[in-house]
Amino acid sequence: MKLKGSLACLLLFLLLGSGEASPLQSGEENTREEVGEAIGHGVGEALGDVLGEAAIHGIEKAIGQGTGKTEGLGIREARDPHLGDALAHKLKEASHALKNTGSEADRQAENIIGHGVDPAHKSWQGTPGSNGAWGTNGQPPSGGHGIPGSQGSSGGPGDTQDQVFSGGSGGSFGANAQGGSWGQGGHRGAFNLGANSQGTSPQPGSVRSNNNRNTECTTPPGSGGSSGNSGGSSSSGSSTNGGGSSGGSNGGSNGSTSSNSGSSNGGGSSNSGGSNGGGSNGGGSSNGGGSNAGSSGSSGSSSDTRNSDHGGSSQGYNPSPSSGSRVGSGVRNKPECDNPHVSGGSGGQGQGSSGEGEAVSGINTLNSQTSSESFNFDTFWKNFKSKLGFINWDALNKGQAPPPSTRALLYFRRLWEDFKHNTPFLNWKVITEGEDLPSLQKRAGGAGQPGTGWQDAVAGTAKNYNYNQQGPPAALGGQYPAKTPAKGGVTVSSSASRTYPGLLQWVKFW
C-alpha cells in the first residue's frame, strides 16, 4: 500500500510539473530547464524513496522469515552499526543511480514539454490580433517573440517552425513568405492573405503589395524600388527589398526587418513569391535560384539578371497582358486602371498587343475577302449545271421532256427482260401478247370434246381481258379434268378455277 501511495504521489507530482510548464507561452528556456530539473530531481528522489522503502521492507521480511523473529527485527532499529552502514551505503548508491535515471527522465520530459509548448506557441501566436492580421502589426500578441534559441536558424523547416508567423514581412501562412530565415523576428508590415507577399499572384490584381484597397491607379515605387510595378519582380539591381519597393515587394515592410534578414538579396531582386528559401539570391542575382517562376504572374520575371541595369524592366517579354503589369500594382484595379503603364512594365504589353493585332488583321483579311467575293447565286448555279452535264438543262428550263435516248431504252429493256426471266411462274406471253384459246384448251386437256360450250365464254374472257364475267370456269386450276367427260358433258374443274375464272390464265403451268 505504501508503494502504491508513493507511485500515486509521483504521478501527481509529474502532472503538477507538466501543468507548471504548460503556461510557458513566452518560451523562456531557463524556466523550462528549471522545470525539467525539478521534475528530474523529483522523479529521482521519489523513485529512490519508494524503492528504498521497498528494499528495506523486503529485507526485514526475508530475515524475519528466515529466523522466525519478526517482532523486534528491523533494519531501521538494527543495533549492529556495520550492517546499518552497509545497507545505507547500498541504498545511497541505488538512490544515486535512480537520480541519474531521473536526470535522463528530466531530459526526456524537457523535450516532451518543449515539443508540447511549440504547438501551443504556434496556436497562441496565430490568434487574430487587433488589426485582424494575426496580431498587432503582424507581431504575436503580448509581445511574444517565440522560444529563445530558435531564432537565427535560416530556413530550418524541422526545428524552428514555431516562428512561421513571426518572421518575414508580409508572410503567407507559413509559406516562408520572403525566403528569409524562419526564426528571424521582425516587423511584419501589411499582411497579405494571399499565396505571395509580392503581389505577384497568378491571378491579376488579386494579391496586392501593400494591402491597399484604395481606388488609385498608381503606386509609388518606394525606397530603392526603381522597378516600380514591373510584374512584381525587381531586376533593377538597386532595390534591396526596401520599403515595399520593386513592385510592392515585402508587402510594404521596411527593408531592415524584412523577411530576407541576413540575405538582403545581395542588392538583388524582390524575391517574388517568397520562394528564395533562406536568402538563396546571393550576389544580386535577381532571384538566382530563388524559383521566382510560377509565383510571379508573368513569365520571364524570374532570374531576369539580363535586365538588371535597365531600370528594373524585368518584364521585357510578357505573353499575357493581364499578368505582370497589373499584379503588384498595390491596388485592386478598376476598369480604368487596367494595363497601367509602370516603370519597366511598358514592354510587357508589346507582345500581347502585337498578337492581338495579328489576330485582328487576320480577321480583317478574312472579312475583306468575304466582302469582295460575295455569294453569287448565278455563278453557283452555272457551276452546278456544268458538273451535271449529263442532264439536259435546256430542256428542263423550257419545260419540254426530251425523248429518251437509245442507251436509256436499252438499259430499261434489259431490266425488264431480267425481271421476266426471274419470274417464270407468270405467263408473260399471255400477259404481253394475249394468247389464243386453243393453246389454253390444249393445256387444259379439253379440246375437241363435247360439252365445251362454256369454252366460248372462256375464250371471250381471254380475248377481252374481262375477268368478272360469270360463266363456267376454265379448267386451269392445276387439277386437270378427266379425259372423258362426265354425264351430260360437264368437265370437272377445281374450286380455284371456279372462283376466279379469268385470273388463272395469267399463271403459267408446267
From Swiss-Prot:
- InterPro entries for this protein: Dermokine
Where does this one sit in the cell?
A: Secreted
Q: Name one GO cellular component term.
A: extracellular space
* Compositionally biased spans, kind Polar residues: 124-137, 194-221
Which segments show compositional bias classed as Low complexity?
293-303, 319-332
Q: What CDD domains has UniProt attached to this entry?
A: dermokine
Q: What is its main location?
A: secreted
Family from the record = Belongs to the dermokine family.
Binding partners and assembly: Homooligomer. Seems to be able to homodimerize and homotrimerize.
Q: What is this protein called?
A: Dermokine
Q: Which organism is it from?
A: Bos taurus
